[in-house]
Amino acid sequence: MPEQGPRMNGFSLGELCWLFCCPPCPSRIAAKLAFLPPEPTYTVLPPEQQQEAGAASGAATPTGSGTCSLHLSERADWQYSQRELDAVEVFFSRTARDNRLGCMFVRCAPTGRYTLLFSHGNAVDLGQMCSFYIGLGSRINCNVFSYDYSGYGVSTGKPSEKNLYADIDAAWQALRTRYGVSPENIILYGQSIGTVPTVDLASRYECAAVILHSPLMSGLRVAFPDTRKTYCFDAFPSIDKISKVTSPVLVIHGTEDEVIDFSHGLAMYERCPRAVEPLWVEGAGHNDIELYAQYLERLKQFISHELPNS
């Protein structure tokens, strides 16, 4: 990174040159601004490797299951028992850009109609999110399907804007084909950077609903709040895609968000053709909305009473 100097909207002149000139293309800007993959907090063992591991340790391993197994590290902060962990299904899919995609299906609401296709934030992976998915799904009566972006967790490749879109396409297809979940029973849920692939997919496919948690208008508008239009070198132009989303959209944003200003959520809400009553969480920042009681209350109201449940 360049040395520090005079700053503009949180960026020094040197940082701006580094950001936009090395090289000047949206995908590189996107990677520098948005992607912070953590050290993986989990591993996934295919069936054949489970057999090998069991033989090496002398432990018995189940035969004939043909399923991958999930192994969490201490940094995953697992909050449940082995029983819940055993109910979490993990597997690999493949994207159109030929990256291996780590996928997770959390069956926490067997009687629920809807499944969330959850696109997480930029500094976590499936291992860190697993406990949250179980808690969220069981409280709002939804199963949860999620995936790690290219370059995150066990997913191969490098994080990029193009890979984001290919990743969620592969996740969408896996949820539909592997689990037989139809579009009218899928709720697309995006959080922070996860709203980018969510909006892109929702602008191309109709689904039961869309939830945008701390969304951004575009990458350039995050770095430069006074930006009023989308330039050719901008990244993540969700603000230009949201008008094409025909499904009901719930926007959630904290009024004191220090990462993606509240104005982003408001602008996205105003552009939605089928926006429902939003949730503006007074005093909440970027990473603590889930701690406020109205978060779960609004989700329950939206899913149980504002969407069809028969």
UniProtKB/Swiss-Prot annotation:
The active site is at 192 (charge relay system), 257 (charge relay system), 286 (charge relay system). It is a lipid-anchor. Pfam families: Hydrolase_4 (PF12146). GO terms for cellular component: dendritic spine; endosome membrane; plasma membrane; postsynaptic density membrane; recycling endosome membrane. Keywords: Cell membrane, Cell projection, Endosome, Hydrolase, Lipoprotein, Membrane, Palmitate, Postsynaptic cell membrane, Synapse. The keyword Hydrolase applies. It is found in: Recycling endosome membrane; Cell projection, Dendritic spine; Postsynaptic density membrane. InterPro entries: AB_hydrolase_fold, Hydrolase_4. Hydrolyzes fatty acids from S-acylated cysteine residues in proteins. Has depalmitoylating activity towards NRAS. This is Alpha/beta hydrolase domain-containing protein 17C. The gene is ABHD17C.
